Regions:
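SAM-dependent transferase fold signal centered on methyltransferase-like domains
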Residues: 1-401
Length: 401
């Protein structure tokens, strides 16, 4: 039996169970188990790749760290809009981002220091229909040194070149790091040369990164993309250019029907209108901006965009008169409100034993308030504990739209 036959026969089985079975003659069991494990991850994360026959998958860590198909396609859309024809991916990895961004390029350079990943890329890229790819098994710093030393190539490509980096976010001890200068490579040391020899740089960073800090460190920021998938913030993508003007934010929530929200950097200083407490009545709509908008700090700009009022200057809950289709926010219809006077609260809570509790600008933790209210998680009732513009603490009962 060949490795390929074994994988095809067993790829939907549990690799841990397979590891306990007798190894058929001619089968490299360790390699096959890695392929089966990778395939099972790819079915959800990379469906197009999982459907291709004979794709090779890397070790589990590389599978976990690679972009999802959804976020890779989003970056592909950015490159198509920018119109570049030469791609240089200085941190190739498994090659998911590279494979999508390279599709419409005249030339695409894949740079990776791990030989095993370069071998996998050499095997996989033709299967994914990629042409005109150049694979370099070296460090990004060494490749860049050699590339810029070739003055003819560097000058020819400069105005049509996009450089992509996804710096490793683990240190030598395998611990996660989040600041740009702690990642490998350290883009802060390379950015001047990268900007000089390219039309654009695209930089993928951790969703945990402080965007304000990144704006201070990085040069030539043209675009900041805050990328969520199904409500969870997954990536920050910075587009840099020596010709950059005022940066623009792009807040997206992939695999949903929500609108994208685009705004200039200056909008982060906008102030939203404040709701009168009497407006928070039965039938009013509460809006909670999605993770991308919250991460970008564009809550107030979002409110201005949709003519919403803020419940309190320090709150990130907003009020409207009616539901809004495809808005990048969760929406809830107000059913009832209560202050925290003992008698009022007792009456308000008398039929509630289970609810989804959210704390916003309120002097308590979720766990402490759940104990006080004697409720369990779950169900179809949503409770918001918050503070109104007159500094009254309230509990708002809602139904999700």
């Amino acid at each position: 039996m060949t490795n390929e036959e074994f994988i095809k026969q067993h790829r939907n089985e549990n690799p841990l169970s397979l590891a306990l079975k007798k190894v058929p003659e001619g089968v490299d069991m360790q390699w096959c188990l890695r392929q089966i494990e990778g395939y099972n991850i790819a079915k959800k994360k990379l469906p197009e790749w999982s459907e291709k026959e004979n794709i090779w998958f890397p070790p589990k860590l590389s599978m976990e760290q690679c972009s999802s198909e959804a976020t890779a396609k989003y970056k592909q859309a950015i490159t198509e809009r920018l119109g570049n024809k030469v791609l240089i991916d200085l941190t190739g990895g498994f090659g998911i981002d590279f494979s999508y961004m390279a599709k419409n390029m005249e030339t695409a350079y894949y740079v990776e220091q791990q030989e095993v990943l370069c071998n996998i890329a050499s095997h996989n890229f033709p299967l994914m229909g990629l042409q005109n790819t150049k694979i370099s098994n070296t460090t990004c710093e060494e490749f860049w040194k050699q590339y810029t030393a070739d003055d003819t190539t560097a000058k020819t490509n400069r105005d049509k070149c996009l450089i992509y980096l996804d710096p490793a976010r683990r240190n030598d001890r395998g611990e996660k790091v989040f600041s740009i200068s702690d990642c490998t490579p350290d883009v802060t040391l390379l950015q001047d040369s990268l900007l000089e020899h390219s039309a654009y740089i695209m930089l993928k960073l951790s969703p945990m990164l402080d965007i304000v800090q990144a704006r201070r460190i990085l040069k030539g920021i043209a675009e900041i993309h805050v990328v969520s998938v199904k409500g969870e913030c997954k990536e920050l993508v910075f587009v840099m250019s020596k010709k950059a003007d005022e940066p623009h934010y792009y807040c997206v929530n992939l695999e949903t029907d929500e609108e994208s929200f685009t705004s200039p950097l200056s909008a982060t200083t906008e102030q939203a209108d404040i709701a009168d407490p009497v407006e928070i009545a039965e039938g009013a709509i509460i809006f909670e901006p999605n993770a991308s908008i919250m991460k970008a700090g564009l809550q107030n700009a979002f409110a201005k965009w949709k003519n919403l009022r803020k419940l309190h200057p320090m709150s990130n809950l907003f009020l409207g008169n009616k539901p809004i289709e495809n808005i990048p926010a969760r929406q809830f219809v107000v059913e009832q409100t209560s202050d925290f006077q003992k008698a009022n609260l007792k009456s308000f809570m008398q039929d509630i034993r289970q609810a989804n509790l959210t704390i916003r600008n309120f002097p308590s933790t979720v766990d402490d308030l759940k104990k006080r209210l004697k409720i369990k998680d779950g169900g179809d009732i949503y409770l918001f504990a918050t503070t109104l513009s007159d500094d009254t603490h309230v509990l708002i009962r809602c139904k999700k739209i």
